[in-house]
Amino acid sequence: MLRSLVAIRASRLGLSSHAEPWSQMSLKELKVECKNRGLKVSGKKIELVRRLKNLNITNSNDSHLRIDIDRPKPPRNKSKKQVKPINSNVKLDRNIVLNSRINDTITKENDTTPTINESNVKTSPIEHVQNPPVEHMQEPPVDHFGKSSPIKESKDIITTTRPYANGFSTDQDNYQTNSLALRDKIFLLTSTTCITIWWWWPHMPSFIDQILKSYKYLQSFL
């Protein structure tokens, strides 16, 4: 009870302290103050004091509201902001693990040997066999009975077939004579026919007479 009474008394003293400077002014001064603050000028002294007092109360409330608005607000949900980098690190770790697994599978697939009909195929490098030239080959020893080794016989065969490899064999000549061009054949035919006509032209009338006589003779039998 005592605390409530003290609070009421303090509020009344505050109101009286706010009202005391306005109450000490004259009516003309109050009208000037109301005019400067945009309030009504008409009325009694008590009404003017109330208007000025209410204006001070509203101004004080507005100032409190502005102070509250201008104050920086504390950040909310601090725990969530702290959790975000942890989640991002976890995602990065997962991506690294997935990439490493994919790389392992790719290397394993590349290491495996190709299969044909479910059988492994082993690739081996191609070996080029180089035979030594014939001139540098050593001749084997000849037997006392006059028989040479098969290596010498093969050498003789190679030496005999060398000229034919350069295009001097009879088979190649025959192939060249048989494979005449069409224009060459036409030229040969025309030349032979012209020569025969030129040779047999003086004897042509007698030859024609003989042909006609033989034809008449055959008709006589028919």
From Swiss-Prot:
GO cellular component: mitochondrial membrane
Main location class: mitochondrion
Membrane-protein topology: Single-pass membrane protein
Matches recorded under PROSITE patterns: SAP (PS50800)
Localization (cell): Mitochondrion membrane
Keyword terms of this UniProt record: Membrane, Mitochondrion, Transit peptide, Transmembrane, Transmembrane helix
Chain residue ranges for the region called Disordered: 65-85, 131-150
Gene3D superfamilies the record matches: SAP domain (1.10.720.30)
Any single Pfam family the record assigns to this protein: SAP
Name used for this protein in its record: Altered inheritance of mitochondria protein 34, mitochondrial
Gene: AIM34
